[in-house]
Structures are given as C-alpha cells and as structure tokens.
Amino acid sequence: MPVSNAQLTQMFEHVLKLSRVDETQSVAVLKSHYSDPRTVNAAMEAAQRLKAKVYAVELPAFNHPTAMGNDMTAYCGDTALTGNLAAQRALEAADLVVDTMMLLHSPEQEQILKTGTRILLAVEPPEVLARMLPTEDDKRRVLAAETLLKQARSLHVRSKAGSDFHAPLGQYPAVTEYGYADEPGRWDHWPSGFLFTWPNEDSAEGTLVLDVGDIILPFKNYCRERITLEIEKGFITGIHGGFEAEYLRDYMKYFNDPEVYGISHIGWGLQPRAQWTAMGLHDRNDGMCMDARAFYGNFLFSTGPNTEVGGKRKTPCHLDIPLRNCDIYLDDKAVVLAGDVVAPEESRAR
C-alpha cells in the first residue's frame, strides 16, 4: 500500500538514528535523475530533523555498452563515479552517505569506505522500505549467526531437489547486512537481514539445483523448471535443464569472460519480514528485489566478482540466486534445515 511522504521521512529518521546520525554528523545524499525523488527528499529532511549537516551530490547516469536491462545489480564495474575524483572526495568528506543511485561492487565505493565514511544504500520502493524497516533485533540476530560463520571452516548445502554443495571457508571474511550503517567504514543496505562469506579460491565443489519456484536475480523470475549447476574448483562447469537453463547459459556466455562462472558470496537469509512471494507483486523495474535476497531461511549464492573482499575475479556479470528448502551446515552443524533457521538459537525469529 502507498506510503505517505510524512511516513517515509519518519522512517528515514528512524534508520538514520540507528546509523548514529546526530548534530555532530555530516550526511551526503548521492542521487541521479533516476533516483526516487521521494526517497531523496525524505533522506534530506530526516537528516535535517536530526540537525546533521546535509548536502546532495548529483551525478549523471552511466550505462556501460555491455550492460543489459535496467537492474543495476546486473553489471559490475564502472559507475557514474568512475574517474570523478571531485565527487568522490565530496562523498568521503561525509560521515554517512545515503546512496540512492547504487555504487555497489565499484572500486570507488571501497575507497570511500576505507576513509571511515559509512554508506547506506536505499533504492527499494517506499512500501518495501516500510515493511522491512530495520530494528536493533535484526542486528542482534544477524550478529549471532555471524559468530558461527566466522568460526566455520566449511559450508555444506543439501536439498531434496538434489543440491549437494561443499565450500571450504576461511580465506575471506564474513559480511553482515542488517539495514543500517552504525560503524565507521560500514556499508549496509536498507532493507536487508542476512549474512554471507566467500568460498576459498578455486575450492567450491558439488551440485546446486534451482528448483521450481526458486529465483534468479537480476532476471527477477521464478523458475518453472529445474536447473542443475555443476561446480568444480570454484566454477560452474555445467548448466543443465530445459529452456531456462539454455537462457541462463546464453546470458552468461554473452559476457565472454570465464570469470563470470565463479562462485561468489554464499550465505543465508534471516529477515522474517522479507517474503519469497513479494517479487511477483512488483514490476521488474520497481527495485532490486531485496525480499528475494533476505527471506528467512533461504540459501543465497552468487556468481561473478569477489574483488570487494580482495579476491581476484573482476568481472561485469553478477547473479544472485536464492534457493528455498535447503539444509545448510557449518562444519557439520545445521544452521538451516528445510528452509527454516535452527541455529544459533539467538538468530531465530520469534
């Protein structure tokens, strides 16, 4: 249902407070012509209500010739900030950047974060922002799960659909998303509520089966037939099935880069207010579909780049694929069974 401008501003005030914005802070709102003007205005007004020093940085849109579609998660690499050092410095000068245009997976974002500036991404429709308004309890549950993930040295996924996937861990850090940026150098995304890490380089092995009803992003469609992925030494080596498997093969082949087949981040969803069904109620250009990435008990894996944590794969093609009804084990300890979070107890929704 529609969210009023007043409610949207109140929501931003809540999230900015969680992000430790007050009269001592400066807030930059990063925008472009395609940013939701209501989101931009609400962020500006909320920051002013909190007596922060607020300013806007507006950049022109950027489209790479190889990018397909309007979903900005589909292409990784250059952004409107690439080569624009003056704009980058203006963002680095802020304590918090509210990103309404999306710098994700860009080297400039990593450089900004290294200065201690915090970044909060907010690009979903207001109705989605309202339903998944972050809470301190979201953070508590995600951090409880992070404790286990940081200690784990292996992740194993199984499902009745046929998935049987193993990934050695430890080379890369665990990353949390709980919806607000409250620590120096932290990037987060409102809405969210999940965690992930990356397999050790060239090590993931096994089979992942996309069952009927599972989701491929950025295609933003529900699978209507099974797709089987064979994985060897960290890379997808086979994509089997019917038309949808053929479509996926053709899409990835288009980028003409063997790195697109690498398994990237892997983790699970912890957000009970995110809904697997929500994507079917939105147009494809409505947003990023964070419901799919965050819904409670999913197994979320991605393909493509891992440079954001110091990996060696820099490639433009990025897929996020959340699976339902999986069993997930860390060092043989179950954390998700049949799509339901079972451990740690502190991470479960009540």
UniProtKB/Swiss-Prot annotation:
This is 2,5-dihydroxypyridine 5,6-dioxygenase. Its cofactor is Fe(2+). InterPro entries: M29_Exopeptidase. One of its GO terms (biological process) is nicotinate catabolic process. Catalyzes the dioxygenolytic ring cleavage of 2,5-dihydroxypyridine between carbons 5 and 6 generating N-formylmaleamate in the aerobic nicotinate degradation pathway. It catalyses: 2,5-dihydroxypyridine + O2 = N-formylmaleamate + H(+). The keyword Secreted does not apply. Fe cation binds at H265, H318, D320. The keyword Metal-binding applies. Keywords: Aromatic hydrocarbons catabolism, Iron, Metal-binding, Oxidoreductase. Pathway: Cofactor degradation; nicotinate degradation. Its EC number is 1.13.11.9. GO terms for molecular function: 2,5-dihydroxypyridine 5,6-dioxygenase activity; metal ion binding. Disruption phenotype: Cells lack 2,5-dihydroxypyridine 5,6-dioxygenase activity.
